[in-house]
Design a protein with these regions (language model features):
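Short glycine-/acidic-enriched loop or helix-start segments at secondary-structure transitions
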Residues: 21-24, 42-44, 98, 157-160
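Flexible, charged surface loops at secondary-structure boundaries
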Residues: 2-7, 25-26, 52-53, 80-83, ...
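Nucleotidyltransferase catalytic core that binds NTPs
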Residues: 77-190
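Short, well-ordered beta-strand core segments
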Residues: 31, 56-59, 86, 113
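Phosphate-binding beta-loop-alpha motif at adenosine-nucleotide cofactor sites
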Residues: 12, 56-67, 146-147, 170-172
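Glycine-rich phosphate-binding loop used to anchor ATP phosphates in small-molecule kinases
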Residues: 1-39
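Small-molecule kinase domains that catalyze NTP-dependent phosphoryl transfer to phosphate-bearing small molecules
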Residues: 24, 34-79
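Short, structured coil segments at secondary-structure junctions
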Residues: 27-28, 53-54, 144, 163
Length: 190
């Protein structure tokens, strides 16, 4: 329900011993089975328990919690919250080859990029796409499991003294700079 209301990632952690009860929650995008316990303390639950038939990753006993977290981050290409990260901020109406080239340059800087999508849908005719539609365009154009966040219509960025990051403009060359989002929207009929 939270995912439907907010259109964001939701993580659910619970013990659900049967396939039937798991199916009642719907199909998750990612299902991780943490299979550490051979037998629980409740005999009735042990008797009815069914191993998941379809999981994306099974974690067995023997790993530390930190090792489990690193395995999940690596397996699903999730962001490492402590690693240096490059921020791309834009409308991406729609995501196109120029944005893709910029993301590739951003990845070269730190190896991890957050794509911050400004919430501008409906502000003008140049902003027809919702956040969800923008993320779909990003995914369709070669970005596997993009780390995107929805942000307000940010129009100004200010900072005080040197605070440990830099703001830089990347020159992608005349051919990339010539790409027009307006023309892309016309081509796509949006």
């Amino acid at each position: 329900l939270a995912r439907l209301l907010e259109d964001e990632i939701v993580i659910v952690d619970f013990i659900c011993p049967t396939n039937e009860t798991r199916e009642a929650f719907g199909k998750p995008d990612i299902l991780i089975w943490v299979n550490r316990i051979e037998e629980g303390r409740f005999e009735d639950t042990n008797k009815m328990s069914q191993d998941p038939t379809d999981c994306d990753l099974e974690i067995k006993a023997g790993l530390t919690v930190d090792q489990e977290v690193q395995l999940i981050i690596k397996q699903f290409k999730l962001p490492d919250w402590k690693a240096p990260t490059t921020l791309l901020l834009g409308r991406y109406q729609p995501w196109h080859e120029g944005h893709q080239a910029l993301k590739e340059k951003a990845d070269e800087r730190t190896g991890q990029t957050v794509i911050a999508v400004r919430h501008t849908q409906g502000i003008s005719e140049k902003d027809p796409l919702s956040y969800k539609e923008v993320v779909e365009f990003i995914s369709k154009n070669g970005v596997s499991r993009p780390f995107t966040i929805k942000v307000p219509n940010i129009t100004n960025i200010v900072y005080g003294r040197d605070v440990g990051y830099k703001i830089e403009q990347v020159d992608l060359g005349a051919e990339i700079h010539a790409i027009s989002a307006t023309e892309k929207r016309k081509e796509l009929g949006i």
